[in-house]
A protein has these predicted regions:
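SH3-family beta-barrel domains
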Residues: 1-10, 73-81
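Basic/aromatic-rich interaction segments and small domains that mediate binding to polyanionic partners
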Residues: 2-63
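Compositionally biased, intrinsically disordered linkers/stalks adjacent to structured regions
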Residues: 54-58, 66-82
């Protein structure tokens, strides 16, 4: 499974349980009805209803950074100094 870290936990819909800086595992990845890349996260609530009464399922992928990509950038940066 893909590992990601939350980089934006502001303005979550009602029932959202993301915490900025915490690592999560992605159970499922898909494109929703609004053509947004969406992640279903293991171990937290992934559905609910917004203040306007619209149902939501999964979290927008823009709220996360891929841990594998972050590790590669750090390694390349350290290599440049040596």
């Amino acid at each position: 499974m893909k590992k990601v870290v939350c980089i934006n936990d502001r303005k979550q819909p009602e029932g959202g349980e993301l915490v900025e800086g915490k690592e999560y595992e992605v159970e499922k990845e898909f494109i929703n009805n609004y053509e947004q890349k969406t992640f279903v996260i293991v171990g937290i609530n992934n559905y609910g209803m917004t203040k306007l009464g619209m149902r939501w399922y999964g979290y927008d992928a823009k709220r996360f950074a891929d841990l594998d990509a972050l590790a590669t950038e750090t390694y390349e940066h350290a290599y440049a100094y040596n």
